[in-house]
């Protein structure tokens, strides 16, 4: 019985730690085709500089689509073909922040954008 209670307690602690991770996106808005937007993501609750980070998006009525990701030190970046040459992912480890500069926006870029660890 003691072992069972200890296990439940350990699970509760681990879940509590996981819940502290926060990724808060900002910078979205309405823009005409051809326009630009810069998205930001403020990270907390984990060592930001230790992780690859990504942007994903979900267009209305569709599933999640990976957009771009960036290595811990920013030295490697990858993009889905549809945004290459238009979107730029970047990060500032000193500010625990991730960015997505979106230029030459198209109607098909309409989506909810999320940052992901």
From Swiss-Prot:
Residues 70-77 are annotated as: Complementarity-determining-2. Residues 20-117 form the Ig-like domain. Pfam families: V-set (PF07686). One of its GO terms (molecular function) is antigen binding. The keyword Signal applies. SUPFAM superfamilies: Immunoglobulin. Residues 53-69 are annotated as: Framework-2. Residues 78-115 are annotated as: Framework-3. PROSITE patterns: IG_LIKE. Residues 20-44 are annotated as: Framework-1. Keywords: Adaptive immunity, Cell membrane, Disulfide bond, Immunity, Immunoglobulin, Immunoglobulin domain, Membrane, Secreted, Signal. It is found in: Secreted; Cell membrane. Residues 116-117 are annotated as: Complementarity-determining-3. GO terms for biological process: immune response; immunoglobulin mediated immune response. GO terms for cellular component: blood microparticle; extracellular exosome; extracellular region; immunoglobulin complex; plasma membrane. It comes from the Eukaryota. Residues 1-19 form the signal peptide. V region of the variable domain of immunoglobulin heavy chains that participates in the antigen recognition. Immunoglobulins, also known as antibodies, are membrane-bound or secreted glycoproteins produced by B lymphocytes. In the recognition phase of humoral immunity, the membrane-bound immunoglobulins serve as receptors which, upon binding of a specific antigen, trigger the clonal expansion and differentiation of B lymphocytes into immunoglobulins-secreting plasma cells. Immunoglobulins are composed of two identical heavy chains and two identical light chains; disulfide-linked. This is Immunoglobulin heavy variable 3-7. The gene is IGHV3-7.
